[in-house]
Amino acid sequence: DALVNKGRGRNIGIDITLERFLEKGLYYMISGSLFDSRYRGGDGVWYNTKFNRNYVINGLIGKEWMLGRNKQNILSINLKLTLQGGDRYSPIDMEATMKHPDKEVQYDERKAFSKQYSPMLIGNYTVSYRINKKKVSHEFAVKGLNFMGTKEHYGHEYNVKTGKIDATD
């Protein structure tokens, strides 16, 4: 049988941004997106896409201080927070999973991406020091990525010890 693509995709949304450019060493930006991302399969039914989180809100704030004999070096601190809807996933077909010889997780694609994990709050920070000279500059930085330890989900797997299906982080 030849493959036929009778599907269709649709993405709609709105973005808004509020930004303050560097003034007296302070800057910030707040942005938000509300969106809906769906596709229509060959069966004519509209489904969520895997990436349909529905919303993302970002906040960034930072401060810079000019240091050094001629105020040519920069000490910088910034913080970024992101709140976003959870990842989408398809429900697990337990019966098909248990029948699979390797217990590989099988998903119910008739309900594709109808489930959604909890919203995620992710935080990052940076502290840096930049040394500026006539023909060269150096920057030293410490970054904390996902410093709150938010888990992101990558799928599911069968746990042989417990006989249950676990989310993979």
What function would you assign to each model-found segment?
Residues 1-3, 40-45, 105-113, 160-165:
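Extracytoplasmic loops and strand-loop junctions of Gram-negative outer membrane beta-barrel proteins
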Residues 2-86:
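Gram-negative outer-membrane beta-barrel transporters
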Residues 4, 33-38, 98-105, 153-154:
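Short amphipathic alpha-helical segments, especially helix-boundary/capping motifs
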Residues 5-7, 50, 112-116, 168:
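Alpha-helix initiation/capping motif
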Residues 57, 104-105, 116:
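Extracellular beta-rich repeat passengers
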Residues 81-103, 120-122, 129-169:
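C-terminal beta-signal and adjacent terminal beta-strands/loops
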Residues 110-117, 127-130:
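Short, glycine/charged-rich beta-strand-loop motifs at protein surfaces that mediate ligand recognition
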